[in-house]
Design a protein with these regions (language model features):
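Short amphipathic C-terminal alpha-helix that caps PH/PH-like domains
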Residues: 389-398
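Substrate-binding clefts and catalytic carboxylate motifs of secreted carbohydrate-active enzymes
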Residues: 14-192, 203, 343, 348
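Beta-strand-rich binding/interaction modules
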Residues: 170-211, 218-224, 232-245
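Structured N-terminal alpha/beta-domain signature
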Residues: 258, 262-291, 374-376, 394
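Conserved small/polar residues in nucleotide/adenosyl-binding loops
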Residues: 1
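Short beta-strand elements
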Residues: 210-212, 247-265
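Catalytic beta-strand/loop cores that center a nucleophilic Ser/Cys/Thr
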Residues: 288-386
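Solvent-exposed loop/turn segments at secondary-structure junctions
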Residues: 41-43, 125-126, 278-281, 379-382
Length: 400
């Protein structure tokens, strides 16, 4: 069975990325093997290609990727990352996202023992602004995704997998390790784990035996360690190194995680937090229009609003949240809204009445008759430390 699958560009296409990352695939008969005929995400051409080959009109200031013929970055980037300020910012951010999506999907396919074939679309572009999901442009300049793809296709690959990219201090972190062997040789190896703190200091190690069966992918072990930090938030890096019988490195990889100190959420009667159903509503004297996300529920919202409730957060904090009930990553937003008179807190992307994609609201607030009215369409699952901190910050809006 062959099929295309673009959940990290045509959001949710084929299968939600949380389920793909967890190990699921499209419906297939029991015992059948399968392949993925196409997948990928868009990354803009290099500045060199743009400046040499693009019409000047496409590049005039202020730079707008929507002027690039056949590019979908302007329309769809709001599903995945913040809007950028200039040409170099758009190139860098789009290519960085493309690399992230390429690694996430390719490694999911490598871990799937029944996935026998897959093809990124495309490897090399034929034209300027041709097919920007290509991982190398028409001048043979590799995008960041080229290197992510190369690394994910190592014949003998160590792949780390987690459904949680953020933890609260005191929890136990569990990261699964898989050994993906595309060679015809079996062998015995050792898998070494190394945990580093934000200052790149080695703080914990561990080793387990790892056997690679020929032409197979298999779970090996989970690295378990306490989520500890003396800071308010800290990025930890787990490195996994595959060693042969001589102690030489065969393959290695790493996964970054963020550990947050716990916070206390104190409800405030002066703050009214609402999550609205699709339709028309009147809130704080304003008409609110709520509609479903136009390209399936989303895994990202932008905090690029300068609102004090999101000042402490980083770009990707509001993305790929864990769902304890489902035990996997699930979307955090299934509806957006538009309203006048409210101050934006979180932004998303949706289609307007003319069929154009553009910015809309995921959360916004208004002070009205002595109370702060907050419309928040996110699923604020409290097992996610960012969701808990955000809820705390919303209630603090009413603190005099």
């Amino acid at each position: 069975i062959r099929d295309s699958c673009y959940p990290m560009w045509y959001n949710g296409h084929g299968i939600d990325i949380g389920r793909l990352h967890r190990g699921y695939w499209l419906p297939v008969k029991p015992g059948w093997y399968y392949g993925c005929g196409e997948y990928g995400a868009e990354g803009l051409d290099s500045a060199e290609v743009m400046e040499e080959r693009y019409p000047r009109e496409w590049l005039r200031e202020p730079f707008d990727p929507g002027r690039i013929v056949r590019s979908q970055t302007k329309s769809f980037s709001g599903f995945f990352y913040d809007a950028q300020e200039d040409m170099q910012g758009w190139i860098s951010r789009s290519q960085r996202y493309q690399a992230f999506a390429t690694r996430m999907m390719t490694e999911a396919f490598r871990r799937d023992d029944r996935m026998v074939s897959n093809a990124i679309h495309l490897f090399i572009d034929a034209w300027p602004s041709g097919w920007m999901k290509s991982i190398m442009d028409c001048k043979r300049i590799p995008k960041q995704a080229y290197f992510a793809y190369r690394d994910a296709l190592a014949p003998l690959l160590v792949s780390l997998r987690t459904d949680r990219f953020a933890y609260t201090a005191g929890e136990t972190i569990q990261i699964e390790a898989f050994l993906c062997n595309d060679t015809a040789k079996s062998g015995a190896y050792t898998l070494a784990f190394e945990l580093y703190n934000e200052q790149n200091k080695l703080i914990q190690t561990g080793r387990v035996p790892a056997h690679a069966d020929a032409c197979r992918a298999a779970y090996i072990a989970s690295a378990e360690f306490p989520a500890e930090t003396a800071q308010d938030r800290e990025t930890l890096t787990l490195r996994a190194v595959l060693l042969d019988g001589n102690g030489d490195v065969v393959n290695d990889t790493e996964q970054k995680l963020t550990v947050f100190q716990d916070v206390t959420v104190v409800p405030n009667d002066d703050v009214v937090i609402l999550k609205l159903e699709p339709g028309l509503h009147t809130v704080a004297g304003e008409t609110v229009t709520v509609k479903p996300c136009g390209m399936l529920p989303l895994h990202f919202v932008s905090r690029k609003t300068a609102h004090p409730a999101v000042a402490e957060f980083k770009e990707q904090d509001f993305s790929y949240w864990y769902n304890a009930k489902e035990d996997c990553i699930t979307p955090l937003l299934d509806t957006t809204f538009t309203v006048e008179g409210f101050t934006p807190i979180l932004l998303s992307n949706n289609m307007d009445e003319q069929g154009n994609w553009g910015p809309v609201l995921a959360a916004a607030e208004k002070l009205y008759e002595g109370k702060h009215y907050v419309i928040c369409q996110l699923e604020l699952r409290q097992e996610n430390p960012v969701a808990k901190r955000f809820l705390r910050n919303l209630y603090r809006l009413g603190t005099k």
